[in-house]
Amino acid sequence: MDIQAALGQRAGVGRYARELLWHLGAEAGSDEIAAFYFDFKRRGMGAPPPGVQMRACRWLPGRVTQNLWKRLGFPPYDWLAGDADLYHFPNFVRPPLSKGKKSIVTIHDVSFLRMPETTEAKNLAWLSAEIHNTARKADAILTDSYFSAREIRELLNVPEDKVFPVWLGLPKWGPPPDPEAAMAARKSLGLENPYLLMVGTIEPRKNIPFLVEIYEKFTDFDGNLVIAGGLGWKTGPTLRAIAESPRKDGIKLLKHLGDAQLAALYAGAAAFVYPTRYEGFGFPPLEAMSRGVPVISAKNSSLPEVLGDAAEWVEGFDAEEWARKIRKVLGDSDRMTRLRAAGLERAKQFTWEKTARETWEIYRRFKS
C-alpha cells in the first residue's frame, strides 16, 4: 500500500491512507501488509501499526520520482517498493508497474471531471489524462460512495464490476471536551456569541461565497458565522466575499486549528451549515453529526446517501430559502433535539473497522 499521502496530509487522502492502514492489520491473518513511502528527508512514519511492515525509499526523493513517472513512465513502482501480490494506491493515480503486477486504486471522486472549473488549472490537464490511464490499467477501483461509483462508471467509461464503493470511517473521538475548557478555547478564538459552523478546505466546491450570502440574509441571527479550514485553491472569490460582506465583522475564518480547538468549536455550534456544490463523500457534516451538532445540508451528490435522514435538507441555492430553513431549525427545540439524536445514530454506521474489513475482502478477490 502506498502511503505517501499520509506523510503530509492530516485530512483528506492522508487521513484515509493512515486510518485504513492502521485498521488493515486486524484483517490480514497470515497475509503480509507492507506500506511504502519516500523518505529522502528522513522524516519517518513512526511505529508501524500491528501487522504492517514499513518500507521506505531514502535514496531517491519522491518529487524526483513523480517527475520521472510523468515524463518517462519509469521506473516501475515495484522496483522501488519491492514485490507484492497486489498494490493499492489510495491517491487517485496508479504509477507505472511492471507487466503483470496487479493493482487497486482509490479514486475518491471525479469532481475535476464533473466540475473542472473548481480544480487548479495546473493539476487539471495532467490529472484528467492520468485518471483515464489509471482507470484502464487498474484491476479494480475503490471509491468512497455509491454516488462516486456511478460517476466513475459514467465519466471514465469503466465496467460496473470494476468499481467498488466502500464507505469511509470516522475517527474514534475521545470524551466530549470539558465545558469550561471548551468555552475558554472558544473565547480565545473570539467566540462568545452563538454561531453557525462550516468546516472544510477553502476551495470552490465548498461554495463559501454563497454561505456568506446566506448569513447576510439571516439578519435576525445576531451570532457569528464560523468557517474553519485551511486555504486550498482558487480562494480569491471566497476571501473577497468575506472582506466585502456587510456582515464581515461577524464572520470568523479560522485556518489553523488543533484537535482540541476543533472539538470546542463543534461543542458550541448552534448548527452546522453545508451548502456545498459537490462531495464524493462528505466528511465534515458527518463529523458534525458524530459530535451531536444539527446539520443543515445541500441535497446533492453523495450527501443524501451518506447523511441519510439525519440532516435537514435544502434543495438548490436560494439564499433566502436557506436562511428560512436555518431559522426554522434554530427556532424549534424539538427539531434540534431530533436532529442531534439522528445524527449521532447515523454516525455510528461509519467505522474504520468496517472500511478495512470491506477493503480486505476486495483485496482477497484480486490478489491471487
Q: Where do the model's predicted regions map?
A:
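Carbohydrate transferase catalytic cores enriched for Leloir-type hexosyltransferases
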Residues: 1-368
